[in-house]
Amino acid sequence: MWKGFLCCLLVAGVTSLQEWDPNRQYVYKVESRAFTALHQISNQYAGILMRAKLIIQPKTREELHAQLVEVEHSQINKELPSGWDQEIEIHDWQQLSALKDAFAIILQNGHIVNVKVKDSTPNWAVNILKGILSTLQVNTQADNLVRHRYNILPNASTDSAVYSIRETTITGECEVEYDVSPLPALPLLQHPELAPLSNVNDNVIDIEKTQNFSNCKRRPAVHYGLAGIPDLEPGQNQMGDFLARSSVSRVVISGTLNKFTVQSSVTTNQVVMSPEMYNSQKGLIVSRVNVTIKDIEEARPIPLPGNLQDTGDLLYSYNNAHDIEPLQRDRQDSDFTLESDSSSSSSSSSSDENSWSRDSHSRISEENKKAQIKQQRIKANRHSDDDVTNDEISFASRERQRRSRTRRSIRNDDSSSSSSSSEEDYQPRPLRGQPPNIPLLPFFVGNRGNAAFLLSSDDPAEIVKSLAEEIKSDMKKPAYIPERSTHAKLMMMRDIVRTMTAKQLQKATSLIHSESKHDLGWIAYRDMVSESGTHPALEELSIWIISKKLSSEEGAELLATLPRAVIMPTPEYFEAFNKLVMDKRVRNQPIVNSTGLLALATLHRQVHDAEFSHNNYPVHAFGRMVPRNYNATNDFIDYLGKQLHAAMADGNRPKIQVIIRALGNTGNKRILNYLEPYLERKKNATEFERLLMVTSLDILAEINPELARQVLYNVYINIGENHELRCASVILLMRTQPPAAMLQRMAEFSNIDPVKQVVSAVQSAIRSAANLKEPGNLNLARAARSAVNILNPMSMDIAYSNDILSSNMIQDMDLGYKDNMAHVGSSDSIIPNTILRKFNRYAGGQAHSDINFSEMVSSVKQLLKALRNPLKQREDPLLRREPVADRREFNIPPIIIDIAPPLEGNMMLRWLGNDRFFSYDKNDIKQLFRNYNAAALPLADMHMLDDMKVYNQKSLAIAFPNALGLPSLFTIDVPTVLRANSTFRLLLNNTSSESSSIEVLPWKLGARSETSLTYSVKEMSKIAIVTPFNSMEHMAALERNILINIPIKLDVDFDLEAQNIALNMKLIGKDSNPRLAQLSTNTYTTNHKITIIKPAIQDEEANEIHVRPARMMRDTFGKLQTGIALNLEIETEDEFLDMEFVRQELQGRDFTSALAFIWARRTINNHNVTLSIDEDQSTTNAVRIEGKYASKINDVDAGTWTEWRSSRVERSAKRHHRPRPEAQEYDSSANPAIVDRADKLEEFLNRASGNRVHGLAVRVAFTGSSDATFDLTAALGLSNVNGSARALVSYISQPAHPADVMPRKTEYDLFAALSMPAPPIINFNQALEFDPDSNLDAGLSIFTNDKPSGNLRIKGELQQSEERRNAIRSTPAALACMREMANGNNNLLPSCRNATEMANRLDRIRLQAKFENLSDDLINNTYKAYTWIRYFTQPYVTENIAQEQNPGRLNINVDVNNDGTALNASVDTALMSITWTNIRLNRWTRSLVEPSPQDTALDRLAREALPLYYEPTCVLDVSQAATFDNTTYPLTLSSAWHMMLQYQPKRSQDDENLDDVPDIIRPPVAILARETSNRRKEILMNLDHTIVAFKPTSEVNVEVNGRILIIEQSRTTDIMAEGNLVLQIHRLPSRAVYMVAPQHKLLMIHDGKRVLLQASNGYRDEVRGLCGTFDGEPTTDFTTPSNCILNDPKAFINSYRLGGDREDNAWMLNYRAQPCVSRNFTSTDIIGKHMPRNPASRGFELPHPVNDTSSSSSSSSESSSSSSSSSSESASNSDLHNNSTSSSSSSSSSSSESAEGAPEKSSRKTSPPQTSTLHRTMVVEEVTEICFSMRPLPECAPRFKPADTLKKKIKFHCLTKGPTASHWLKMVKKGVNPDFSKKREHKQLEVDIPAKCVRH
């Protein structure tokens, strides 16, 4: 039955042919068009139309003869109002004679399988023929069926069907969906062109064909630069969110599905894309081929040429760019074949293989004949033989030889492979020194199918030289770069360089290279060679570097470009790159060598990252870039690994960092083999190097997140690891998209993790990840939300480690970003020692990494010390005198010196489009300053700098053939130019009296320069169609420009000692009205000639695309203020240009996305915004800025405030002799032009009385024909004894004015006095009872030309409401404080300090203002400001209009609610009342609107950011103490002195004399405490030989160096030493002593029983004592002088006891009895090992069996299962340890040892598995000690005995007999195996080890 059915199908297949009558010929009319446009902006199209007649004469059933006649073409560039398919009247048709020759069509089962053409027919013509014939490819019988459930197969009885088949057309061998249905007569009547030769009674069938590009076996396309788009298949129906592609054919046939005639066939191919990948307005490439039958005539012979050649099926064939010989496409070695290609192909037949072999042989044997044809073809192209260089001819010859060798190799090596000939046809891979043969791109196919200048008389080297000269000329006027299309010229240069051979590049170099480093033409050529990314370019770059044509920095910059720019990283490319990096001459240039290593490592990663390589390189045209098993990458990693070990041995720290980063850049799992011994502490490395190893796993985390996640999690979970490594692991772990279960484990662990740095990192990471919005991170966001409520709720200081993830999506624009900002907190500084930043932008579904920054340093404090003065010999703090200088003697405990880590650091950043990495150590910093010192004197002479950098921020291209067989392409380039042209000299005074030393910052610095800085970027988006026969590129383009141009003359004088700065600036340049900035957009269509080197936008045919008539707006500003007239010109086609337009454009954007997508617009249209200087209207041309800062410390008491006000009024009145309002408290001067600004600042400092006064004077003067001056003088006085502050501000404005107009001078004099009491700050109860209400008094006087013109007086009260006070009592902090006070009279613990601070905050503000004679301008500006406030607070504001009353008065009331979460405000004016209700407050705004007499607004903001470490505080309260790191413990002090704080500076490993440093030191700063009667505390301080004693009696008395001080509440007592302020002391209202030591940055409050000490963060990690270690971790606070960490607070206190009663040794016994726990880090297995799954084989003891029978059975089964599990485990972990061997099974049971009397199945159920061998710690008891084996040893399990033994020497750890040894002995007997592996080895003993165990 089945045989009969198959026979029927075969008969049907044979007869299912188009009804070709051999006696007739068929005449078809061919009409085709291909257009490109930004069609959703405007119906303006550019493109080509073609028409012809196709005559087909059948010869046999398998062969047709055909000819195209009357072939004509025409191009258009105009608007088509009705769209691309409207009828177009064309008058200038041109002949296309290359298509006139007859050809043959070979059929197989009715399908076109080959087209034979004349051998001289160019390849582009063949593709056009195939495009026309593709419309006639019809499969009505469902051959090559693609199985689908919805298929309805055709049959002879019906004319309808739905099915999918695989079919070959010009655009690919793809799945094609057929929809077949009868076509009724009515549509034919309406559209007779569908079937012109059909009759009314004919059976007409309509066939709709839809090509599915997402399911293709062969798909001609080329692409690059598409990395970052997940799940992309270039050329498919949809690519990302930016491009969609479709191809639909409508075929109308008459007859039946068995025999039919094609009446008409129309194929329409459309590509719709976003020009910038994100736009809602799209662009279009459309092509259509319409073949309609015109006549069926009597057959007339169509003579075929005699020299026909096969061109294959209808698939588009690639051109040969570098040879006029038709391209013979290679079938690549299977190692280069894409997996998708080989997997989708079927096995080849032997006949195909033989045919391939014959073709190869025949091509080789006809070389001479083809050489003759080549000569003829050159003449046919109207070029002589001389036009083809010898280099090109030799290249073609070598290419043919290579093809022959390749084919022979494949035929011989792969003849047995079923897939050898089924792989995709690929372009030939470029030979060494030859450019790639990239298909479909204009400069490779634009000249009659060849490279643009292959057949041209123009030499590419000469053309490149000409472009370099043009660019050089353009750069002379950088402000006009956009108009001159310099960026387009740069891209043309790059494209031409891509087509050039190595010899051509060498010639171009000889023509362009200049010995001058400032030749801009050479610089442009230099950068474009690196941007071209070809093998010849790399060879040329290598020559430049080795021959030192480039400086080291230039060479490094170009090498860093290569991973981004390379277009085909083939094995030959890697070989050349590797040869360059390994060259000795390059290794002698460290910066070049290190950058080259990093770039090469990055390139290895990019090629081996399957998704990146597939999307970024033209793999569908060339196959894989490197073979599947490319050993060069492994060899490179092995080389880096060896270099790492060697550098570790040499101690070359910068080199170590470079190698670690290079290993990380590879992103290969094999790097773990080299990092593992260091990460697991099996080999020595510094903690910083281990940290760098972890952060270098960032690439691995992206490429292999599962593997990286396992490693990073193992680092994180080890609480014995360094916190920096653990935090870095958390940061990278979040980049691996961890699942919800893992995040929940981390969140739960944060509740028990003892390290706060790590807890903070986990908290911030999970909380921020829960708010991610970017679609690619929705799974992470969901997982984080599942864990966020499990987190430790503790609030963390931002000084701790943080990992902040944020994202945003602008949905309607398909734009977004993901930002990861993280830092790892430092233990020795508030500044983080590691900062990581990764910022990705998303556009159209493509992710692009814009920022990849990291900054790491081993020790922030060590770095700051090195930067202060690396060469100057500083006083060694160890040489200072002993700290206690009075007559007492104390036994100060010796403190073991902590050794600071060696200074190491690095920075990685993306600079000028490239990733750069800089590493350093202390020697590098010293060398940096030596170089600075050496360069200081030469820089005093005038120097010239004229440099430029050109780079391409983004390069993207995708191209494929359209329905006409012509290349269609979409490209984006973003060329960027950064130019600096400067002449400068530096005037330095940086040497001290000692000629051998320098200062980091000179005391005086001067600079004189004339500089022109230019930044110009152009985004170039192009949608184009290439017609190779006339070298035209029909395009629609979008270009956006950003230009910033600053030509300026700058003189700077800086005096550090006098704190003065002066700047003189003047715009320079030869251009009139110099342009400063420009932002523009241009859209246009054009038909561009490829071989004419000219920017497309400059074509005569270039037509701008206009949406609507442009509007011009021009405004000049600044003329009346500064005298410099700035012109703002706006030309735009936007419909609206107002605030609503701005709001709509910013809709959906947060601040980050607004900056990241600054030029992204929702609509596309032409606009131009230009900012320039109008020199004709400007009256000034230079500006001088002068600034001076001054400060003063006064001895002022509280009563001075009244005296200051009254005396000030008198002095003001006497000096001015003019009437002033009573509110005016300050008069600037009668003649400001005479009084020097320095004198005025000094006067302000004297009048703004306070303990601390800060002053600032700034003057901005514009000079020219009419001067303009603006003077600001301000002073702020602050009190040390209360919260009062006083401010004076004077602002004098004298704008520019015409010569015939009197100058107008306006003066604003402001005074403000805030009077605040001194509140209780160490007693919460007193704070609740205290009245903190404060007063504000302020006034503003305005003078115009020295005459009063208005004044304003404000009086106000700042209050605390009774409701707020009552609410504070019930807050958690207040309740906790009350409990602490009740339990131990403790007032200074953290909860009480927080409660006291809340009790001093004010929640009510009442202001009354009176004003008169204010100018209308000031009133109008005030109202405008109010309208802005009203706009942004619209939901909260209400207005009530009232009758005018109380004119000249204004009342402002502000009330904050009790929780500080919202405020109400009201403003009452004469005309209206305005009310704001429930304006929400966050913690930052709350700090601003709730003033407090205890601190300033800046203090409150800083405390919100750094609640723990803004003012690090240590407290000794009555019965409890709190450390700097917030550890609270019970406190009991004896009468002996205890060390409260001891400054303990670390010694650096970099110090040369480290070996000479003693193990203990006596520090220069120490604070001692002891208890006297009534739990009072006496304090003794040593501050660099200044001894301060605090002695509590009835009140605390203070002695300084034995002298008793008189301390008052109303003023400070200042202690000076050597002209420096050492101490400031005063009493608080509670009579407690308040002391500040500004030089030592210490603050202390002492009330007799309690001591509060605040120290700056400069003491971090360098103190010891009762205040803890101050390293950020409470777990280390109880560190003793011997660096042991205790758990008992009493023992900890005793460890810092300084002696006392010699008879009382109980405290010492208590201290010594405590176990010493060191701060050493522990290591764990970070990277999984090959371990057997059997627990017993891993050293665990399993439960004993119940009976012998089950034991025997389980032993047998376990033996086999252990072996299999071991092997499977080995396989599962093979990606972690490729070079490791799996552990063998420890089971020695044979398979014959099975159970007796019980079935195997039941034994598995009743007994657990058992092994014959166990691992246990061996114990050897001796006379005085017990010894334990350091590792568990094998021994026979119960019921087993040794069959044989071996003697081995085993390491033992021994303990003296006693409690400890007995404890461990008991544990071993219980079956526990203690870990003695890290203990000290005491002896080796020879013991018997069982070799095999057998049953008893």
UniProtKB/Swiss-Prot annotation:
Matching Gene3D superfamilies: Lipovitellin, beta-sheet shell regions, chain A (2.30.230.10), Lipovitellin-phosvitin complex, chain A, domain 4 (2.20.80.10), Vitellinogen, superhelical (1.25.10.20)
Signal peptide location: 1-16
Biased composition (Basic residues): 400-409
Record InterPro entries: Lipid_transp_b-sht_shell (IPR015819), Lipovitellin_superhlx_dom (IPR011030), Vitellinogen_b-sht_N (IPR015816), Vitellinogen_open_b-sht (IPR015255), Vitellogenin/Apolipophorin (IPR050733), Vitellogenin_N (IPR001747), VWF_type-D (IPR001846)
Residue ranges of every copy of the VWFD domain listed in the record: 1512-1705
Biased composition (Low complexity): 335-354, 1750-1794
Start and end residues of each stretch annotated as Disordered: 325-437, 1209-1231, 1727-1816
Alphabetic keyword roster: Disulfide bond, Glycoprotein, Secreted, Signal, Storage protein
Pfam families recorded: Vit_open_b-sht (PF09172), Vitellogenin_N (PF01347), VWD (PF00094)
Record field: transmembrane: none
Gene Ontology cellular component annotations, sorted alphabetically: extracellular region
One of the record's GO molecular function terms: lipid transporter activity
Composition skew (Polar residues), residue ranges: 1805-1815
Cellular compartment(s): Secreted
PROSITE patterns xrefs: VITELLOGENIN, VWFD
Residues that carry a glycan: 155, 212, 290, 593, 631, 684, 852, 981, 989-990, 1168, 1282, 1394, 1413, 1420, 1464, 1526, 1720, 1747, 1778-1779
Biased composition (Basic and acidic residues): 325-334, 355-370
Residue intervals of the Vitellogenin domain: 20-835
Disulfides per UniProt: C1514-C1667
PANTHER family: VITELLOGENIN 1-RELATED, VITELLOGENIN-RELATED
Function as written in the Swiss-Prot or TrEMBL entry: Precursor of the egg-yolk proteins that are sources of nutrients during embryonic development.
Name of protein: Vitellogenin-1
Species annotation: Periplaneta americana (American cockroach)
